Amino acid sequence: ASLKDSYQFILDALDRAAELLELEEDFDTDTQGTLYDSIYFNEYTVHALRARVLLYMKRWDEAIKYATKVIDSGYYYLSSCTRAATSSASYYKYMWTNDFSTEAIWKVGFTVNAYGGALGQVFANYDYSTLRPDYVPATWAVNLYDMNDLRVSAFFQSFTTGYSHGLTWPLLIKYFGNESFTNYNILHVSMPKVLRLSEQYLIRAEAYVQCDQPDYGKAGSDISVLRTARYSSYGGSTSLNKENAMDVIEQERVKELYMEGFRLHDLKRWHKGFERTPQDQSLSNGSSLKVEK
């Protein structure tokens, strides 16, 4: 099938899913339970996935429409980096350490008796003694975060690795593992948060900027809402214009969605390439890679 036919197949499936999963008119979260942090599909799961697909298709106005449906529904709330969920974790960090969040639209449900792959294995390889990661965060990515951006402490922690060179580096702890699973000696296993509210804000912000009649004010407002939930303090507003808007949004997607599987799609959509820094290893073949835009 062509790419066009493949996308149409997806949109048709989403149309049917929206019909089957439509909420009842009298749906009430007080009596029927919340929709956030769900392992089940519902009408807004479909809207969120459709917004992502429409972004990839560059159908900006429709992406705005469906992201707005999710954002304005009132069923999901950005997890705060400043409000404490426990004595040791903010609500945002708790999303990654305990797999519970008011902004998760849909997650893959795991139990200690039935769980998927260890997402964090390659970033830590902890053996109860040392950490020997296969991959470490790139300096340019870590340096994107501002001083008062509290995502840093949720995503990264400096360790001295167990390798002979004794590298000390900020390692990715975003997927270090659900603490409940760790209690059963199940390491680096986390429930994938496939759809989150923060992504919907980023989808809408990008679509506002890329559409035929850009609205930089609304795009800046969406970035401000997200940063307010992520920073220790974020005063004022995010000023976007034709010259800086996409740079800001591109960086914000890296900072918020780091290592969640979006990067390649983003680079393709933005017509940007990348270059891998040559690695110090025994095999030179594949050690470096450059992909042009």
What are these regions (language model features)?
Residues 1-198, 210-217, 242-244, 292:
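Structured, solvent-exposed acidic/aromatic patches
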Residues 9, 118-119, 239-293:
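Long, intrinsically disordered, low-complexity segments
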Residues 201, 216-232:
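Active/binding-pocket-proximal capping segment
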Residues 205:
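Active-site-proximal region of nucleotide-activated glycan assembly enzymes
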Residues 209, 228, 246:
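Active-site/pore-lining binding-face segments in mid-to-C-terminal subdomains
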